[in-house]
Amino acid sequence: MPLWGASTSDESKPKNLTAEEKSRTFATTRGWEIRRPDGTDEVIVAIRNLSAAEKLAAATISQVFFTANSYSTGATGTVRVVWNERVTPTTTGTLVVTRSDTSATITATRNGNGGPNYVNFNFTAPSTTGVTLTIGAQTITMGINDYGSTTVTSDLTIATADVNAANVDGGSTSVVTTA
């Protein structure tokens, strides 16, 4: 079994990385790169000839998670969507956060550009304590392209398997509101 993928059918991140490291890792024409804490990018797997379309397809979502384990009532919460390649948002965007106490949903709105391979969406936590918030399968309403391209549209569909956050920046796949 290969330790990483480098084709349009398998753009999998290096398997030896932690979940937190994977959230900072993305494919470029040089190979797999990781964003270091100082803000620089480091090639961790060098792969040649990745610029052709048969190697790097449109960026796909690899992780979706809340950036905290809980939010105080009325606080600003954040959902982070991570792609497997660098991306460039082209329009504002939204996604839906589901509440456990009602059938109502909360709209999270894109907050800036995020990072090289992720976008943050902010929302206001409900004013009721003990409400569990989750992220379900959905399509993000937003314009986004692969980095450096104006013609390759990146994936905007969140699958249930994309919602994962094990040990990512203290994040979680569901959160509970607290007082």
Predicted segments, located by residue:
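Non-catalytic beta-sheet/beta-sandwich ligand-binding modules that flank or precede catalytic cores
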Residues: 1-179
